[in-house]
Amino acid sequence: MLRYAIVFFIIALIAALFGFTGIAAGAVEIAKIMFFIFVLLALVSLVMGFTRRK
């Protein structure tokens, strides 16, 4: 699960790079939404990883 958290976090950072810097002008809103979705998925995966270890 922690591996998924890291993967989702990296995807969120890439989406933020495209969405917040204006590189992909046509897809700004989609990239911003994807950023928040993948940050949420990263947090959920992180919490699930910590709770499974106990």
UniProtKB/Swiss-Prot annotation:
* Location (main, coarse): membrane
Q: Which UniProt keywords apply?
A: Cell membrane, Membrane, Transmembrane, Transmembrane helix
Cross-referenced InterPro entries: DUF1328
Q: Which GO terms describe its cellular component?
A: plasma membrane
Membrane topology, as annotated, equals: Multi-pass membrane protein
Q: Where are the transmembrane segments?
A: 5-25, 30-50
Q: Where in the cell is it found?
A: Cell membrane
Q: Which family does it belong to?
A: Belongs to the UPF0391 family.
How is this protein named in the record?
UPF0391 membrane protein Daro_2080
| Species of origin | Dechloromonas aromatica (strain RCB)
